Amino acid sequence: MVDLEQLGQQAQQASYTLGLLSTAQKNQVLTAMATALTSHQDEILAANAQDLENPQVPVKFVDRLRLTADRIQDMAIGLKQVVSLPDPIGNVDRAWRNEAGLMIAKERVPLGVIGMIFEARPNVTVDASALCFKTGNAVILRGGKEALHSNQALVQVLRGALRAEAVDENAIQLITDTSHATAAKFMQLTDYVDVLIPRGSARLIQTVLAKATVPVIETGAGNCHVYVDKDAQLQMATDIVINGKVQRPSVCNATEKLLIHREVAADYLPSMIQALREQGVEVRGDAATQAIVPDVVPATDADWGTEYNDLIIAVKVVDSEAAAITHINRYNTQHSEAIVTDNYQAGKLFQQRVNAACVYINASTRFTDGFEFGFGAEIGISTQKLHARGPMGLAELTSYKYVIDGNGQIRH
């Protein structure tokens, strides 16, 4: 079994030194990491091939797991983009002088040691390492067993870049024991880990929430909806739904449910469902949908709360916008929701009343992404309200402290 106490101690010690690095020093290391990824591409791809050869890898994980030369190049580009982003560490959010003459400033600081728990996504290894390093945080990575060889190769490359730049390589560490027992112990490493960020399925996230004693930032399972209002441009709605469902069905910002106002359902659903089927999507529908398109798969109650991560969508006809909002707030995961409408008031009501991190008018749910929001690479998409919500970039990986300058004041 991996010595988690030792990993934690090493990460904590590394975090102390990271906090002292200048922005220029951090950017130099990140640039070295980008160069190392491309120069070690063959080793990374060979390790990834070992993971892909495992017959136990679920089919729906293969796209997430697969690395190619282009994807490694994208990782390197992502690292360089993090270099170009402003460093939040040391920024002063607010400063003022109090009545006693003390100068008080609220200053951005690293969180410390961040624990990442994720599944078959090797890109998370690089994204998380880059964002944590830029913000002066050490990171301990615990990926899924499906991606173990890929993660080991990537971490070896990143740690090599740290060593080459004379930075403590324990700023980035990987837990190679993928057993549930070790994961459970990691979730309770409160002496060393300041926050856990799980990325993966709803089951993984719920397991972390149930077992962790380390504080958790809950990231998104994505049971995302598109509601087509009675005042929608229907071709626009079709384009948005197809993009949200088909472009990358395995990701958390993919569209999983389609709600349609009853006034346009009869005219619109046949063409919408045909367009989905042409893209290989299995369509499940409620009774009203079945009445319009009889050969859809009947939807069950379980469908409304399910994140498929696959080419499957469930369709429901609703009587009003209010009914759509009620349904969404009951079944969603507070990730990303969209309305298609030309009615300004309807759109704004939807944005006001839907409980989600990201609420769209006339746009695909697929835009919930750190790069698309201009944050650079994201470490995850938070679906909770405390500390961070939505795509988590650099700023969300910081805390703050108050620094107070005086000249001998005592309190009376």
From Swiss-Prot:
NCBIfam families listed in its UniProt record: PRK00197.1 (NF001221), proA (TIGR00407)
UniProt organism field: Lactiplantibacillus plantarum (strain ATCC BAA-793 / NCIMB 8826 / WCFS1)
GO molecular function: glutamate-5-semialdehyde dehydrogenase activity; NADP binding
Functional summary from the UniProt entry: Catalyzes the NADPH-dependent reduction of L-glutamate 5-phosphate into L-glutamate 5-semialdehyde and phosphate. The product spontaneously undergoes cyclization to form 1-pyrroline-5-carboxylate.
Annotated compartments: Cytoplasm
Pathway assignment: Amino-acid biosynthesis; L-proline biosynthesis; L-glutamate 5-semialdehyde from L-glutamate: step 2/2
E.C. designation(s): 1.2.1.41
Gene that specifies this protein: proA
Reactions catalysed according to its record: L-glutamate 5-semialdehyde + phosphate + NADP(+) = L-glutamyl 5-phosphate + NADPH + H(+)
The protein's name in its UniProt record: Gamma-glutamyl phosphate reductase
